Regions:
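Positively charged n-region of N-terminal signal peptides that target proteins for export
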Residues: 1-9
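C-terminal motif of bacterial Sec signal peptides marking the signal peptidase cleavage site
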Residues: 16-19
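Bacterial signal peptide processing site
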Residues: 21-23
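N-terminal helix-cap/turn-to-beta initiation motif at the start of protein domains
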Residues: 25-34
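Post-signal-peptide N-terminal segment of Sec-exported extracytoplasmic proteins
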Residues: 39-75
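Short, structured surface segments that line ligand/substrate-binding pockets
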Residues: 69-109
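Short, well-ordered, aromatic-rich surface patches in folded extracellular/luminal domains
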Residues: 92-136
Length: 136
């Protein structure tokens, strides 16, 4: 009986540790390191480039401060089974790599930000609409 109780306690302990993991934050470059943001709508191909530093800083801040981890994983280069999405590409000067992308989309009346192979976050609908409104 003690053996089963020990196994049960070990199982509960491991479960508690994995269930209480820290929430992931979306990873974006610092606004000062970004030279350009390009927002492209898929599948239409409509695009806009943003080079003004104040606007770049606002977009980065809005995305960072208005996302909440869903715990979902991203296993692909772009969202799967999503017909319409925005690709927000961040171009910057860095010796290791020079661009990064975040996909924004709506699914079942909720809005999401997805980084390839990194994760999926909920993003406030107002921020999604503001960024998508830059295409008009």
């Amino acid at each position: 009986m003690k053996k089963y109780m020990g196994i049960a306690l070990a199982f509960i302990f491991v479960f508690a540790l994995t269930a209480c993991g820290a929430k992931k934050e979306i990873s974006l470059p610092e606004a000062k390191d970004i030279t350009e943001i390009e927002i492209t709508e898929n599948p239409s191909g409509n695009a806009v480039k943003i080079t003004e530093q104040d606007e770049i800083a606002k977009i980065v801040k809005d995305i960072k401060e208005n996302t909440k981890d869903t715990g979902g994983e991203s296993y692909h280069e772009q969202p799967v089974n999503i017909k319409k999405f925005l690709a927000v590409s961040f171009y910057y000067n860095n010796t290791e790599r020079n661009w990064e992308v975040v996909y924004l989309y709506e699914n079942r009346n909720k809005t999401y930000a997805e980084q390839p192979y990194s994760g999926i976050w909920k993003i406030k609908k107002e921020v999604f609409k503001e960024i998508s409104g830059k295409l008009k």
